[in-house]
Amino acid sequence: MSLDSNSDTEFELVPKFQTQPTRGDAPKSPELEEVSTVSDLQDELKSLRLENKDLYSLMEQLKKDNDEMKKSLEKVMKNQAELGELEEIRAIEDDKRSEKLATELVAIRADCSSLNRSERECRYDIERIFAKLEEESFFSLHENPIQRTISGTWKVIKISNFDEFFAAQDISQFHALIIKNQCLYFKVNKHQVKTQSYHERSWKPRAREEIHYFNFPNSLGELYSVEKNKLILTVTQEENDKKKVISRVERSVVDGQMKEIWERNGVICERIFKKIPDQRDSRAYPRSIYGSESQNIYY
């Protein structure tokens, strides 16, 4: 007997092959063998139906799980879409904040630039005020400050201890003549002193003006300063990597006359000057403080 593939309830009985009974086995009747085969088939069919039912239950569970996974996936996709929208909104807000910050930064830079200009203007005004105060105090340290009284042209009228002074110097007779008949011109302001030296007669065409800045020596070591209402000139030279003062001149104005005390090579010479009208040659040319001559010992 065999099971039809189109129906699980209809059976067809086919004759079984006759087998020879084995030794020791009792022979069975055909009716009993047919009943046993039908019972086995029914049990197998029942088992298949149970398995089919289990498979159907499993399929239903898988379908249910699939639906739940689909819902979860849709929820995840929805959340991702919402996150994308939030990120887009956040990016737009960030761009707006960046634009606002950039605008504020430009405004701050403009304010800083304006403040810097105001600061420079204020500093300039303050420096100008302090310079004015300093200049006024510079000229008001004494009742007759040397900075004002020495300005003008002076001519030698008296000289003391000149022979001893001349003997101690390495100068020519020509320079000695200049020292005896020298005219000096001074013009002092806050930071500098202008000087001019010339012979009253033969040196007028070669008169020369020099500019010296207070407390700054020139290339020849000539340094002007004001000490105790006196105009001081010191000349230094380097010897064995050390600076040595080789000449010092103190000038002061007393009773309308300029008194000069000049010390050089350990010997002192004193000269007295009187103020005279300006007789400098108009052809005289200004010179830098770095153009002095090495023989300029009579300043």
From Swiss-Prot:
Region Disordered, residue ranges: 1-38
InterPro entries, sorted: Calycin, Fatty_acid-bd
GO MF terms, alphabetically ordered: lipid binding
Top-rank taxon, per record: Eukaryota
Stated family: Belongs to the calycin superfamily. Fatty-acid binding protein (FABP) family.
Protein name (Swiss-Prot/TrEMBL): Uncharacterized protein EEED8.2
Organism of derivation: Caenorhabditis elegans
